[in-house]
UniProtKB/Swiss-Prot annotation:
Gene that this sequence comes from: CAB4
Alphabetic keyword roster: ATP-binding, Coenzyme A biosynthesis, Cytoplasm, Nucleotide-binding, Nucleotidyltransferase, Nucleus, Transferase
EC id: 2.7.7.3
GO molecular function, one term: ATP binding
CDD domains found in the cross-reference section: PPAT_CoAS (cd02164)
Entry's family note: Belongs to the eukaryotic CoaD family.
Function comment: Reversibly transfers an adenylyl group from ATP to 4'-phosphopantetheine, yielding dephospho-CoA (dPCoA) and pyrophosphate. Plays a role in the physiological regulation of the intracellular CoA concentration.
Main localization, broad class: cytoplasm
Disulfide-bonded cysteines: none
Enzyme class: transferase
Name of the molecule in the record: Phosphopantetheine adenylyltransferase
Length: 305
C-alpha cells in the first residue's frame, strides 16, 4: 500500500496529445524518485462514450508508462481518474500537485489541502481537443455488470478493464477474481499475490474511480463464475483475449433459463503489439521482475491506493 505522502497528482483540463503528455509526465520525475511513489492523473472533462474512454486511457497509460520506464522507474503506480470531480473530497493526500495555470483552478488548492503546488509547464489549451470517437453514449448504461480475471499485481491493463467497467455501470459491479488454487500452474507462482490481497487492490481502485458504486468481489473457480448464477447481471466486460469465454457464458445462461448478456469488449488491455502495448504490462512480467529484483520491497506497478 502506497504511503499517502508519496502521491503526486496531475490535473488536466483536457486530454493532451502525445508529445505534450510526455513533457507533462517528465515534469513529475523529480517528485517520483522514490520507491513506491504513486502518480494520479485527473482528467476534468467528462467522457461520454466508452469508445472514447477506452481510446484515451489506452494512449495515456501507455505514454505515461513509457516515460516512467524511460527513467528506470518501474515501481511507480499510475491511476487515471475520470468523470469523478468529487475526488477532491476524498481522504487522499498528495505530496505534490501539478495544476494548470488557469485561474479557474486556484480554488482547487483549498479543496486539495496541503502539499507543494506547481504549474504545469508546456501546456496550452489549444494543444488538445478531447478526441471525438463515434459511439453510443453509454455512461451508466447497465445497472449490473460483471467481469473477471486474476488481477495479480494490478497493472495498467487491468485498470483500463476496470475503468471501462465502472463507466458503463450505474449500480452494481460484480468482479470475479481467480481463486488461489487455480493459479498453481502459472509462471513464478510463488510470487502471485494472495486472493485477499488481489481483492483489496481491485476494490481500492474501483472506489477511487466511482465511490458510490456497489462492488461485489467473488472467487472465480470456473469459466462462468457469477455470470452463470446471477440472473440480474446485464453485461459482461471482456478483453479481446477473453472474448471467446463470453460465448460459453451466454450458452450456459440460456441453458439455465437466464437472459444472455450484452458483451462489452475492451479493445486496449495490453500484451498486443498492434495496440502499442508490450509484455511490460503482464502480471507474469511483473513477477519475473520481482524474482530478479535486488530490492523486493519495491513492487513494480505498485497497487493504486
Amino acid at each position: 500500500m502506497v504511503e499517502e505522502n508519496s502521491r503526486v497528482l496531475i490535473v488536466l483540463p483536457y486530454t493532451p496529445p502525445s508529445a505534450t503528455l510526455q513533457r507533462i509526465i517528465g515534469q513529475t520525475i523529480p517528485f517520483l524518485r522514490e520507491c513506491q511513489s504513486q502518480l494520479d492523473i485527473v482528467i476534468v472533462p467528462e467522457f461520454k462514450t466508452s469508445f472514447q474512454l477506452d481510446s484515451a486511457l489506452g494512449k495515456m497509460y501507455s505514454i505515461t508508462r513509457d516515460v516512467l520506464l524511460g527513467y528506470g522507474m518501474i515501481n511507480s503506480g499510475i491511476n487515471i481518474i475520470f468523470n469523478n470531480i468529487h475526488f477532491v473530497e476524498s481522504n487522499l493526500q498528495w505530496k505534490v500537485v501539478l495544476l494548470p495555470q488557469e485561474s479557474t483552478f486556484e480554488t482547487w488548492k483549498l479543496e486539495l489541502g496541503q502539499g507543494q503546488y506547481h504549474s504545469i509547464e508546456h501546456y496550452a489549451l489549444h494543444d488538445n481537443i478531447m478526441e471525438e470517437i463515434e459511439g453510443p453514449k453509454d455512461a451508466n448504461k447497465f445497472h449490473v455488470t460483471a467481469l473477471g480475471g486474476t488481477f495479480d499485481h494490478i497493472h495498467d491493463g487491468h485498470k483500463i478493464l476496470l475503468s471501462v467497467s465502472t463507466f458503463i455501470t450505474s449500480q452494481r459491479l460484480i468482479c470475479g477474481i481467480t481463486c488461489d488454487e487455480l493459479l498453481q500452474n502459472k509462471k513464478y507462482k510463488e510470487l502471485i499475490e494472495p486472493y485477499d490481497t488481489r481483492c483489496r487492490h481491485v476494490h481500492q481502485f474501483i472506489k477511487l474511480l466511482k465511490p458510490d458504486l456497489s462492488v461485489e468481489l467473488v472467487p472465480l473457480r470456473d469459466v462462468c463464475g457469477p455470470t452463470g448464477k446471477v440472473p440480474e447481471i446485464e453485461c459482461l466486460v471482456v478483453s479481446r483475449e477473453t472474448v471467446s469465454g463470453a460465448e460459453t457464458v451466454n450458452k450456459t445462461r440460456i441453458e439455465k433459463g437466464m437472459s444472455p448478456l450484452a458483451v462489452h469488449v475492451v479493445n486496449v488491455l495490453g500484451g498486443r503489439e498492434e495496440d502499442g502495448w508490450s509484455e511490460k504490462l503482464s502480471s507474469t512480467e511483473i513477477r519475473r521482475l520481482l524474482k530478479s529484483s535486488a530490492s523486493p520491497t519495491c513492487t513494480p506497478q505498485n497497487p493504486c491506493v
